[in-house]
Design a protein with these regions (language model features):
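Short, small-residue-biased leader/transition segments that mark boundaries at the very start
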Residues: 1-7
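Long protein-protein interaction modules used by eukaryotic assembly/scaffold proteins
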Residues: 15-23, 154, 189
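Catalytic core of non-heme Fe(II) oxygenases with the double-stranded beta-helix
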Residues: 78-157, 176, 191
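Short beta-strand His + acidic residue motifs that chelate non-heme Fe in jelly-roll/DSBH
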Residues: 90-93, 166-172
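Short, compositionally biased
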Residues: 171-181
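Double-stranded beta-helix
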Residues: 183-194
């Protein structure tokens, strides 16, 4: 629990010290998104490197699929914070880089309360307020995997291949913001490993 609080505190500090607007580079239909600085590469070195290594040992090292003439280390290329208000959303999109991540810092709604709204109540695909990955299965069907949002997801994180399509659905009837941090991990082509 102590290390989780340390990580969250570090990320909240990044948010407090946020930089310029990042909206022009994002697919999001949201009012506020800002660049973040990972001071002294703390988050990258203490969290992301281990997660990338775990992903590579469990599945495949996606960096090996990038055509380069030599090996390169990873670098946290970009990191930003999104302040999502009700009715705002991120349409289906992917990212640049090799790996991407999202950390949910504040979730003011629950999936169950959102899906009790009249527009979703009788839906055969209730998804408002959720985060979703979209992918093609082995027979070519487009499928979705949903993360049902709730305050219990605060501090949760997902690392995924940057090219994996994903979306953030809007939430309704809540004046509080949803706050999330996202970023892209790329190969550092300025530094070759031999």
């Amino acid at each position: 629990m102590g290390s989780e609080m340390c990580i969250r505190d570090s990320l909240w500090k990044c948010i407090e010290n946020r930089g310029e607007s990042n909206k022009r580079t994002l697919a999001g239909n949201i009012c506020e998104s800002n660049e973040l600085i990972d001071e002294n590469n703390w988050f990258f070195n203490n969290i992301l490197v281990d997660l990338v290594n775990q992903y590579a040992s469990s599945f495949i090292n996606l960096g090996n699929t990038v055509p380069t003439s030599c090996r390169h280390s990873y670098v946290l290329d970009t990191m930003w914070v999104n302040f999502q208000k009700q009715n705002e959303f991120n349409p289906v999109h992917n990212h640049s880089g090799v790996y991407s991540f999202v950390v949910w810092m504040k979730i003011p709604t629950t999936s169950s309360e959102q899906n009790s709204n009249p527009i979703a109540r009788d839906s055969n695909l209730p998804c408002i307020g959720n985060f979703a990955f979209q992918y093609q299965n082995i027979v070519g069907d487009i499928k979705s995997f949903y993360y049902e949002m709730s305050p219990e997801m605060e501090g949760g994180m997902v690392l995924f291949p940057s090219k994996l399509m994903h979306a953030v659905y809007p939430f309704f009837n809540c004046q509080e913001e949803r706050i999330s941090i996202s970023g892209n991990i790329s190969l550092d082509t300025s530094n070759a490993l031999f």
